[in-house]
Amino acid sequence: MTKVEAIHKVSVVIPVYNEQESLPELIRRTTAACELLGKDYEILLVDDGSSDESASMLSDAAEEPGSHIVAVLLNRNYGQHNAIMAGFSHVTGDLIVTLDADLQNPPEEIPRLVAKADEGYDVVGTVRQNRQDTWFRKRASRLINRLIQSTTGKAMGDYGCMLRAYRRHIIDAMLHCHERSTFIPILANTFARKAIEIPVHHAEREFGESKYSFMRLINLMYDLVTCLTTTPLRMLSVFGSIIAVLGFTLSVLLVVLRIAFGPQWAADGVFMLFAVLFMFIGAQFVAMGLLGEYIGRIYTDVRARPRYFIQRVVSRGSVSTSKENQQ
């Protein structure tokens, strides 16, 4: 029987982007939830290039006496998942919990995730109950979940919920992956041997607005498709092959009909022209698909730019500068 590693310290990573209204309540409730764990803990708040007072508020909270807050300040906005990866690079805990800053997933759920991870799970996911989102957000989330499940074969119910817990070896494995487009729940599940989901409460957003606009959701879907699989490129080749075969079949049929019914039936070769045109269009799609396959692989290999740049890390009694945190 595999021995379950004990959890001595819990790290909570929270990406923050223009959340100055919710920060005081977020810090208070997250700290209170962590105090109930009976374990050592730290709370890493990653400012993802906020344009409001979020960064200065995080720095002040981190410098307070007795604070468990670590403020990780990025130089600009890199997106939710890259901000979380920046936080991962500075965690010191055995179990890492991720949480959104909007308080729609209550921090009070953290002890439940830690208790479930204590049972030996590598990844503890969550499923939002009675989601307090718009109809469009719910439908988009359901579509994305189905896309991920069909592509990865992992039957997880709610990939969009970022309230999750990961064992330290899962975090270390993800940090060794250097692709620029990262979707953390999917990446974590590729390394997890044991994963489980538990239901959690979902509240209405009290402060500000959602940072995921319609276009950002569309971009997220494209990122998911391109970072998960090269199937769309292969489907392009398949589609081109089908068109080419149909064009060739039509050409043969037209030749037979011309022989059987004479040249008048073939409209002076117009139908034959279309048949040949379909053949060439199909061949072009096949060629484009093959080129796309190679370009996609080259693109995957050369994506070596940093996912984020940490400008400053502020914790109780210490401040590190950007020179120490280039990623």
From Swiss-Prot:
InterPro entries: ArnC_tfrase, Glyco_trans_2-like, Glycosyltransferase_2, Nucleotide-diphossugar_trans. One of its GO terms (biological process) is lipid A biosynthetic process. One of its GO terms (molecular function) is undecaprenyl-phosphate 4-deoxy-4-formamido-L-arabinose transferase activity. It is a multi-pass membrane protein. It holds the Pfam family Glycos_transf_2. Keywords: Antibiotic resistance, Cell inner membrane, Cell membrane, Glycosyltransferase, Lipid A biosynthesis, Lipid biosynthesis, Lipid metabolism, Lipopolysaccharide biosynthesis, Membrane, Transferase, Transmembrane, Transmembrane helix. It is found in: Cell inner membrane. SUPFAM superfamilies: Nucleotide-diphospho-sugar transferases. It catalyses: UDP-4-deoxy-4-formamido-beta-L-arabinose + di-trans,octa-cis-undecaprenyl phosphate = 4-deoxy-4-formamido-alpha-L-arabinopyranosyl di-trans,octa-cis-undecaprenyl phosphate + UDP. Its EC number is 2.4.2.53. PANTHER family: UNDECAPRENYL-PHOSPHATE 4-DEOXY-4-FORMAMIDO-L-ARABINOSE TRANSFERASE, UNDECAPRENYL-PHOSPHATE 4-DEOXY-4-FORMAMIDO-L-ARABINOSE TRANSFERASE-RELATED. This is Undecaprenyl-phosphate 4-deoxy-4-formamido-L-arabinose transferase. It comes from Enterobacter sp. (strain 638). The gene is arnC.
